[in-house]
Amino acid sequence: MRLQSLSSVAIAETRRQIILTIINSLVYLVNFISCPSIHSIPFHISTHLTSCQANISLLKIVGLHCPFHRRGIASLSVCVALHWIAFSCSVMCHFAWSCALPCFVDSFFPSNFFLRTYALFTFSLQLWSGNDLQGNHSYLATPTR
């Protein structure tokens, strides 16, 4: 009975995160198309927030359904690796499109690739340690059994 209730919670949370991902992606796209300058302050603020939230939503979906994570097998190393890959992709998009994608990191380390990479890695570890950006308990940090 408990397993069935955990499964229904995971399904409901997955649906919620998919909806959040779609909304954040659409907001990001509208901002990208409608903003006259990709270097304007409103563009940076909105894209930082929406792209970061979209990444977090996708990673929560991965965490909820990852068999390693659900069984508690190598959850830290496997899931941090997935998180690191996702943020690395965001960094590559940053260089390709010349706009700030992942979070607030670009504002603090605009020109130093190594500092940016280190900051993203520590930020991903912080998310996995138990809290997301709003201070809520992260689904990724606690394996469901």
Swiss-Prot record:
User: Which protein are we looking at?
Assistant: Meiotically up-regulated gene 124 protein
This protein's source sits in the domain of life called Eukaryota
Locations listed in the record: Membrane
Q: Which UniProt keywords apply?
A: Meiosis, Membrane, Transmembrane, Transmembrane helix
Q: Membrane topology for this entry?
A: Multi-pass membrane protein
GO CC terms: membrane
The gene for this chain is mug124
The organism's taxonomy opens as: Eukaryota, Fungi, Dikarya, Ascomycota, Taphrinomycotina
Q: What does this protein do?
A: Has a role in meiosis.
**Transmembrane segments annotated in the record for this chain:** 18-38, 95-115
Q: Tell me a GO biological process for this protein.
A: meiotic cell cycle
